[in-house]
């Protein structure tokens, strides 16, 4: 959405409506273009209570979930042999209560959970029912479980190509349920069997209430064979690495960072690249909204400004930007902002002197013909930070 304000008398109601649009339905940015003549003009302020929002612009989904959808979901859960919860960023955007309701439902049903890059933290990463992240950079067990499942319950994910791969071969034998407040995301990439265009918090709470009020019971041993197969896949230990005596591996560095900070009030942001994927794999988030990263757009230079914002909003928290050296350089001047506002953000740089993800693709697909992926002129980051009085 975007607005061009030509009349100053419309400015306050435009701002109110823009914030309503940004927060309703699937959250997203709204641009308000205020020309210079409007900036210098004066007008009476219109309070939000007096603004008549245009209904076609405020997309918030249904206010309640269809009971028939709930009954069908419970019926399929009870009949399935190999179910899985596939959870995306929509669960986080719905608010922390959505994660609480998801955990309740998972514990009742004994169904495994996998999350997207943006869904990390919706379900505790160290919980045995978590298969961690799926997709191109996900775990072996998560990807195999998605492919082999007979029931897929999509909670606020968009079936993006990093998860599905070839659409014609994606989870061919599963019944698919899709929860999404954005109607345009349903049946967009993958055809689903059942759908609800309802806020996820409301949906999951309604399902949990239905189960409790109707006395619905689930056989916890129903999926023993499924869990046995998953444990066999887990045995491959797809994220295994060996830490030697000479060089600190990035996986080890992030794992140790997690072990030393997971008991504190911590927010983690990242730049974009291999370090971002290692952070997603080895930092096990136990709470929602503690992981801030640029996924869909993949914007290098994102991490430090995001850390500054997180620290401003949470002054008592530990805020860490896990960065690669090339991505960090793209917004390095923001050290000045952090210093000026006395924000104690921590920058954790994994410096391998390469744009690692670019190099990785050049090795995999282009016969190791490297082009513009090696960074030869790097500063001493410690001295550079000190020059900003950091």
Q: Locations of the language-model features?
A:
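Thiamine diphosphate
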Residues: 148, 187-189, 195-197, 201-205, ...
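Conserved thiamine diphosphate
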Residues: 1-40, 117-120, 146, 156-178, ...
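Glycine-rich beta-alpha junction loops
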Residues: 34-40, 89-91, 183, 272-276, ...
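Active-site diphosphate/adenylate-binding microenvironment
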Residues: 228-305, 310
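Glycine-rich phosphate/diphosphate-binding loops that line cofactor/substrate pockets in enzymes
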Residues: 20-26, 69-84, 105, 146-148, ...
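Glycine-rich, acidic loop regions that bind phosphate or pyrophosphate groups
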Residues: 1-14, 36, 119-226
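Conformationally flexible catalytic loops at phosphate/diphosphate-handling active centers
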Residues: 17, 21-79, 239
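Glycine-rich, anion-gripping cofactor-binding loops and their flanking helix/strand elements
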Residues: 89-177, 286-316, 329-332, 374
């Amino acid at each position: 959405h975007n607005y061009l304000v030509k009349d100053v008398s419309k400015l306050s109601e435009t701002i109110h409506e823009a914030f309503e649009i940004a927060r309703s339905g699937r959250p997203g940015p709204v641009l308000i273009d205020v020309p210079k003549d409007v900036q210098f003009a004066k007008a009476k302020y219109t309070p939000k209570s007096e603004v008549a929002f245009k209904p076609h612009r405020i997309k918030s989904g249904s206010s309640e979930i269809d009971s028939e959808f709930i009954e069908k979901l419970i019926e399929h859960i009870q009949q399935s042999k190999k179910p899985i919860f596939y959870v995306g960023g929509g669960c986080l955007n719905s608010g922390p209560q959505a994660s609480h309701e998801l955990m309740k439902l998972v514990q009742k049903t004994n169904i495994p959970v996998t999350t997207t890059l943006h869904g990390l933290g919706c379900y505790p990463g160290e919980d045995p029912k978590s298969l961690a992240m799926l997709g191109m950079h996900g775990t072996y067990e998560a990807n195999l479980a998605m492919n082999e499942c007979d029931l897929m319950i999509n909670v606020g994910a968009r079936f993006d190509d990093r998860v599905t791969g070839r659409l014609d071969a994606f989870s061919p034998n599963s019944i698919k349920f899709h929860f999404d407040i954005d109607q345009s995301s349903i049946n967009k990439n993958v055809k689903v069997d059942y759908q609800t265009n309802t806020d996820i918090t409301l949906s999951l709470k309604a399902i949990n209430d239905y189960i409790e009020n109707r006395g619905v019971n689930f056989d916890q041993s129903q999926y023993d064979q499924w869990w046995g197969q998953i444990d066999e896949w887990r045995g491959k230990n797809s994220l295994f690495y060996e830490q030697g005596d000479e060089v600190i591996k990035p996986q080890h560095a992030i794992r140790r960072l997690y072990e030393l900070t997971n008991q504190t009030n911590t927010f983690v942001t990242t730049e974009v690249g291999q370090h971002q994927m290692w952070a997603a794999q080895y930092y096990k988030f136990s709470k929602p909204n503690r992981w801030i990263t640029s996924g869909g757009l993949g914007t290098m230079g994102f991490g430090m400004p995001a850390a500054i914002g997180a620290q401003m909003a949470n002054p008592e928290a530990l805020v860490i930007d896990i960065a690669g050296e090339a991505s960090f350089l793209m917004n390095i001047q923001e050290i000045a902002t952090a210093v000026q506002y006395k924000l104690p953000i921590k920058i954790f740089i994994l410096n391998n002197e390469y744009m690692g993800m670019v190099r990785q693709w050049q090795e995999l697909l282009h016969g190791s013909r490297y082009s513009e992926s090696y960074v030869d002129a790097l500063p001493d980051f410690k001295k550079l930070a000190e020059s900003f009085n950091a």
